[in-house]
Amino acid sequence: MSMVYFNIFMAFTVSFVGLLMYRSHLMSSLLCLEGMMLSLFVMMSMTILNNHFTLASMAPIILLVFAACEAALGLSLLVMVSNTYGTDYVQNLNLLQC
């Protein structure tokens, strides 16, 4: 494994660990998800370019489309929660609490 792939994999791992550790705030969870998507995009693009997979060249663009949709939905949820409750705690999203 080259050093570039290792660094991108470490970026994904750090984002994933950040998602697990800082899951109490919605904004930090969204930032960690975006970091994971960015590292996946770079890893997928580099793999496709290095291995000359011409049939899979659309996959990184499709991943970016899904990441943009995820970001838009996450930010709209963040705005709704912060307007309703005044904070961005994820525990406010639990519908089973009274």
From Swiss-Prot:
It is found in: Mitochondrion inner membrane. It comes from the Eukaryota. Keywords: Electron transport, Membrane, Mitochondrion, Mitochondrion inner membrane, NAD, Respiratory chain, Translocase, Transmembrane, Transmembrane helix, Transport, Ubiquinone. It is a multi-pass membrane protein. The keyword Flavoprotein does not apply. The chain crosses the membrane at residues 1-21, 29-49, 61-81. One of its GO terms (molecular function) is NADH dehydrogenase (ubiquinone) activity. Core subunit of the mitochondrial membrane respiratory chain NADH dehydrogenase (Complex I) which catalyzes electron transfer from NADH through the respiratory chain, using ubiquinone as an electron acceptor. Part of the enzyme membrane arm which is embedded in the lipid bilayer and involved in proton translocation. Core subunit of respiratory chain NADH dehydrogenase (Complex I) which is composed of 45 different subunits. This is NADH-ubiquinone oxidoreductase chain 4L. It comes from Arctocephalus townsendi.
